[in-house]
């Protein structure tokens, strides 16, 4: 009886931990307007590559870069595990808006929801790097 309860509790804990884990697939399928947003007056053809550079300069590793459509870039990046963190996933969406401005949205997910030592929001460092890169190109 005790063994059955222990196995049941272990299974329940494993399911809870797995369910709380973020994945790149989950990040890709989140709404494109999720996250912190900043608008830029530069063209999409300039902001897209600059956003990728900004992600790298912020200390993240780029996993994939895709274009869901002709007016949108999606960058998926990761911050690896460390002594104090299980890591994080970051999605940057760069999209042309109808008024010709380019919206950059940064959405961050902790790999494990209970990971309180993770940064939690990479928008500040990414926007800071993007501002520097775009300012240098002007």
Predicted regions and their residues:
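Bacterial N-terminal signal peptides that target proteins for export
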Residues: 1-10
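Flanking scaffold residues of small Cys/His-coordinated metal-binding clusters
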Residues: 13
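C-terminal motif of bacterial Sec signal peptides marking the signal peptidase cleavage site
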Residues: 17-20
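Ser/Thr-rich, low-complexity intrinsically disordered terminal regions
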Residues: 22-138
């Amino acid at each position: 009886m005790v063994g059955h309860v222990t196995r049941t509790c272990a299974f329940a804990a494993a399911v809870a931990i797995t369910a709380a884990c973020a994945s790149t697939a989950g990040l890709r399928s989140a709404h494109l307007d999720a996250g912190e947003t900043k608008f830029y007056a530069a063209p999409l053809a300039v902001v897209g590559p600059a956003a990728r550079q900004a992600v790298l300069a912020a200390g993240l590793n780029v996993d994939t870069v895709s274009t869901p459509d002709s007016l949108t870039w999606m960058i998926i990046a990761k911050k690896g595990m460390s002594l104090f963190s299980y890591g994080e996933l970051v999605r940057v969406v760069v999209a042309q808006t109808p008024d010709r401005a380019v919206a950059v949205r940064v959405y961050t997910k902790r790999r494990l929801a209970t990971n309180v030592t993770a940064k939690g929001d990479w928008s500040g460092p990414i926007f800071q790097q993007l501002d520097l890169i775009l300012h240098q190109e002007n």
